[in-house]
Amino acid sequence: MPSRLRKTRKLRGHVSHGHGRIGKHRKHPGGRGNAGGLHHHRINFDKYHPGYFGKVGMKHYHLKRNQSFCPTVNLDKLWTLVSEQTRVNAAKNKTGAAPIIDVVRSGYYKVLGKGKLPKQPVIVKAKFFSRRAEEKIKSVGGACVLVG
């Protein structure tokens, strides 16, 4: 049967309030706060706060990250960077005006030579070209333009 009163109400009027006799429920038996993290509270600190103690390495100020960032695209994916309409117009166009594909605008920096190009001239703008890519683009009558 549930009782009507909470435990604290029941203990009123009893000197020790459930904490034993002389000096039992004492002040701070384990030390205050985080005291003893390396000693008597070691297990708690190791389990729930790993890495709390000890030294950490130095901060490298002015570190230049991603200096070698150079996303690449292959020749076989080159025509996917422009719209289908541009591709159709370039195939129909016999006047010799080659379409311009700027791979830097599509998020790539370097053009690699994997795959084949269709036999129509194209102007490719990129920051870097591999030797094979440059040869293949020029073999279909295109041009390689170095940007920035």
UniProtKB/Swiss-Prot annotation:
Any one cellular-component term (Gene Ontology): cytosolic large ribosomal subunit
Residues annotated with (3S)-3-hydroxyhistidine modification: 39
Segments passing through the bilayer: none
GO annotation, biological process: translation
Top-rank taxon: Eukaryota
Alphabetical list of Pfam families matching this protein: Ribosomal_L27A
Entry comment on modification after translation: Hydroxylated on His-39 by MINA.
Region Disordered: start-end pairs: 1-38
List of residues that carry Phosphoserine: 68
Modified residues (N6-acetyllysine): 47, 55, 110
Bias type Basic residues, positions: 1-30
UniProt keyword list: Acetylation, Hydroxylation, Phosphoprotein, Ribonucleoprotein, Ribosomal protein
InterPro entries: Rbsml_uL15_N, Ribosomal_uL15, Ribosomal_uL15/eL18, Ribosomal_uL15/eL18_sf, Ribosomal_uL15_CS
Keyword Coiled coil: no
Sample GO molecular function, one term: structural constituent of ribosome
HAMAP family the record matches: Ribosomal_uL15
Family the entry assigns: Belongs to the universal ribosomal protein uL15 family.
Name of the molecule in the record: Large ribosomal subunit protein uL15
The species this protein was found in: Pan troglodytes (Chimpanzee)
